[in-house]
Amino acid sequence: MSAKGAGGARGRGAEGEKIVATNRRARFDFTIEDSWEAGLVLTGSEVKSLREGNVNLSDAYALPRGDELFLVNCRIGEYKQAAHFGHEPLRDRKLLMNRPELDRVKGKIEQRGYTLVPLRLYFKQGWAKVELGLAKGRSHEDRRHAIAERETKREMDREISRRRR
């Protein structure tokens, strides 16, 4: 599935960043309280596939295992030209963070109701990075409220632009 299927826009972010995919679903399903940047341990065919935008973050999350953090359920599609040197699309991928930062993140994840979800995947100066958000699940009422707010804002913007004409 391409980056568009992952709910994200491809293009340039901040200086030196090339956005591969964004997880728009995460911002709808969860309340994001904090975010961190982490590097990814990838194989060559995974990097090539990412550069083509062949990634899906919609069901992905990060999970601590021992003293390490892993990205689980992130689908990086197979790179066609890799043939038998390819990779497994749904394998768990190790995340790279500084030790104090990793300990802080693990402490927050262990609190009840929190999870770590990828918000966007991008290349920064040639290195694959993922922005992780500390997320707390939203209730259905909160989701409906967010939709109502968004619709109200759209209507106000439409009315303002209509009056300017």
Swiss-Prot record:
UniProt entry keywords in alphabetical sequence: Cytoplasm, RNA-binding
GO molecular function, one term: RNA binding
Subcellular location: Cytoplasm
InterPro entries with a match to the protein in the record: SmpB (IPR023620), SsrA-bd_prot (IPR000037), SsrA-bd_prot_CS (IPR020081)
Transmembrane segments: none
UniProt keyword RNA-binding, yes or no: yes
Region feature Disordered, mapped onto this chain: 141-165
GO BP, one annotated term: trans-translation
Keyword DNA-binding recorded: no
GO cellular component term of the entry, any: cytosol
Pfam family, any one: SmpB
Family affiliation: Belongs to the SmpB family.
Function recorded in the entry: Required for rescue of stalled ribosomes mediated by trans-translation. Binds to transfer-messenger RNA (tmRNA), required for stable association of tmRNA with ribosomes. tmRNA and SmpB together mimic tRNA shape, replacing the anticodon stem-loop with SmpB. tmRNA is encoded by the ssrA gene; the 2 termini fold to resemble tRNA(Ala) and it encodes a 'tag peptide', a short internal open reading frame. During trans-translation Ala-aminoacylated tmRNA acts like a tRNA, entering the A-site of stalled ribosomes, displacing the stalled mRNA.
Full protein name: SsrA-binding protein
Originating organism: Anaeromyxobacter sp. (strain Fw109-5)
